[in-house]
Amino acid sequence: MFNIHSVEIDWGGRPLKLETGKIARQADGAVVATYGETVVLATVVAAKSAKEGVDFLPLTVDYIEKTYAAGRIPGGYFKREGRPTEKETLVSRLIDRPIRPLFVDGWRNETQVIVTVLSHDMENDPDILALVASSAALTLSGAPFKGPIGAARVGFINDEYVLNPTLDEMVDTQLDLVVAGTADAVLMVESEAKELNEDIMLGAVMFGHRHFQPVVQAIIELAEKAAKEPREVAVVDESVLEKEILGLIEPELRAAYAIPVKQDRYAAVGKAKEKVMAHYFPEGQEPQYDKLRIAGVFKELEAKIVRWNILDTGKRIDGRDSKTVRNIVAQVGVLPRAHGSALFTRGETQALVVTTLGTGEDEQYIDSLSGTYKETFLLHYNFPPYSVGETGRMGGTKRREIGHGKLAWRAIHPVLPPHHEFPYTLRVVSEITESNGSSSMASVCGASLALMDAGVPLKRPTAGIAMGLILEGERFAVLSDILGDEDHLGDMDFKVAGTEQGITSLQMDIKIAGITEEIMKVALGQAKDGRIHILGEMSKALTNARAELGEYAPRIETFKIATDKIREVIGTGGKVIREIVEKTGAKVNIDDDGTVKVASSDGESIKAAIKWIKSIASDPELNAIYDGTVVKVMEFGAFVNFFGAKDGLVHISQLAAGRVQKTSDVVKEGDKVKVKLLGFDDRGKTRLSMKVVDQETGEDLEAKQKAAEGATAAE
C-alpha cells in the first residue's frame, strides 16, 4: 500500500529522519521530518496551470502548530486552533524567504507549502525542522525549484558556536541565529545577539552554512529515490524586446532615475511607461504582445538602468555615493501626554515611535507549544497606506508588519534593563508616517529614543541601518541606507542593528549565488560605519535615558512578602486585594515567589497600598505603639483594629489608669485610640493596652516611668 522512502543522518548529536510515501500521498510533495522527538509534516501542492493575470510568483507558506503536538488542548471557548499566532506567522516568513528566490523565473503556478507540527519534544524548536522539511518536499514535488536548501540554528555559548542548541541551552546563549541556503550559497539569515562584533556574527553564518551541508546531501539522496520529474517552464528570450524598448525610452528612464524625490521620480517613470504602452498597444489596433509581458520587460529595464548607473558612475538614484547615509533629523518628547515619544526622519522615511509604561496587569500571556509565558516587552509596527502616498484597506495586522515589528523587537530586546531592576511592562508602537526604504530600521532608531525619553535605562542607544548589494561578475557595490527602489533592484539586502559595542540584530536576504564571505565581510564593515554615524545623529536629540519617568507614567515600587502570607493579602476570592486597590487607587500584582509590585502615578497612593499590604503580611512588634480604631465595645473591654486587618483586646483593666466601671465610659465604637502591644494570651489572642500610652502624644508612659525610676536609682 505504501511506497516509503527515507533517509536518516546524525546531525548535531541527534538523529534527523526524512520520510516520504506514507502520509499525504496526494500532495505533489510530502515529507515527514523527525529531529529527536519533534516531528513536522511538510506538504507542497502546485497548480497544474499558470495563474492568469499575474506577473509574480504566487507562493504561499503556512506553518501551523497543533497543540496536540505538546499533549495539550487549546484554550478558549471553541477548544481548537484559531488564527495564526505571531510565531506561526514569523516561521511562515522564515520558510518563504529562502525558498522564494529559488523558483525558476517565469513560474506563475499557484504553489502552496503547508508545514504542520505534529510532535514537540520540548528540546528541539520545530522551526528549523520546518525549513528542512519544506525544502525536501519542494525538491520531491516536481515544482521547478532550484534547491534543495538546508538550514541550521547557531548559538554562541562560552565563546563557542553551538549547532542547533536545545531550548534549555538557548537560555544561556549570546546569539540566536538562523541561517539557510544551498550547498554553495547562504540565502537567508535571521538573528538576535547580545552586542556581538561583526567577525563573530559572520563566523556564525559560515559555521551554520558548513554544518547544514549533511542535510542538503540527505535531501538529495531522498530525491534520487522519490522525486518527481521537474515541470518544464518555458523560458522566453526577451533580449530583442529589451533592446527595442530601451531604444524607445532610455534617455527618459535614465533621467527619471536621477530624480531624488520619490514621488517626482515615480511620475517620470510612469510617463516613460505610458510611452512604451502607447507604442505597443495603439488604440484601435490588435495588440501584438501581452500587456504583462511588456510591463515585465519594462520592469527589468528599470532594474538594469539603476544597476548600471551605480556600477558605472558610483552614483545612486538620489545622487549619493555608496556609503553616504541620508540626512537625519531626530526629535524626542513630541507628544505631550505619551510616556515617551520620538520622531525619527531619515530622508523620505519617517517613524513616529511611542513608548508606554505599564504594570504587571499589562503583560502579554503567550500560549506556545513549550508552555505559557509572560512577555513584558511589546513592539508593534504599523505601515498605513498613506506612508507611501497610496490608498489601501485598513484592517488586521499584516504578515509584513508582524515581521518588521519582530525585527525591531530583536534589535532592542538585548539592551533593555533586567525586569527585576525595571519592573515595567513596555509597549513600543512605531507608526510609519513616510516610507522610502528602511522603515524597520527607522523603527529601531525611534524605539531607542522613545524608550530613553520615557526614562527606560537602556544599556546603550541602539540604531539600525538597511544595506544593499549589487553584483555583476567581478564588480560589486555595497550600498548604505538603501532606498525602496534599491531594495527591490539589488541582489542582497540586509539590515543590521546594534550599539557602538556590537550587533543586536542581523537580517539578510540574498537573491543570487556568488556572494562570498569576503563580500559579506565588506558589507558588514560598511554597515558598522553607517550605524556609528546614525548613533551620532541620534545623540543630538538624547544621549541617555531621562533621570525621571514621564509625568504621566506610573511609578512602581517592588518589595517581597513571605509566600505563606500571599493568601492573606489576596483574601477569600480576592476580597482583600480588591479592597486595597479600590481604596488606595494603586495597582497591585503579587507573584508566586512573594514579589509585590505596587503601581500608581500618585506617590501617596503607592505609600498607602504598601503600608496596608505590609500590615497584613507582617507581624506586629511586641511593645510597639500603634494607632487603632475601636471596632467593638464589650463589658470586659474593647476590641481595637490596630495593624492592618488585625484586631486585639484592650481589657477593661487596661483602658485607663484609674478603675473603670463600664467600658463605654471610656470608649465607644469608631473612636481613634493609641495602643501598646503587650503580647498574646494562652489562646494566641492579642493583648493591648491604652492606659500605658499617652492618648494625646502617643508616648509610652510605662517606658517613661521605668526610665525615671532608673534615673532616680542612679542618683
Swiss-Prot record:
Keywords: Cytoplasm, Magnesium, Metal-binding, Nucleotidyltransferase, RNA-binding, Transferase. InterPro entries: ExoRNase_PH_dom1, ExoRNase_PH_dom2, ExoRNase_PH_dom2_sf, KH_dom, KH_dom_type_1, KH_dom_type_1_sf, NA-bd_OB-fold, PNPase. The keyword Cell inner membrane does not apply. Mg(2+) binds at D487, D493. It is found in: Cytoplasm. Residues 554-613 form the KH domain. Residues 696-715 are annotated as: Disordered. Residues 623-691 form the S1 motif domain. Involved in mRNA degradation. Catalyzes the phosphorolysis of single-stranded polyribonucleotides processively in the 3'- to 5'-direction. Belongs to the polyribonucleotide nucleotidyltransferase family. This is Polyribonucleotide nucleotidyltransferase. It comes from Rhodopseudomonas palustris (strain BisB18). The gene is pnp.
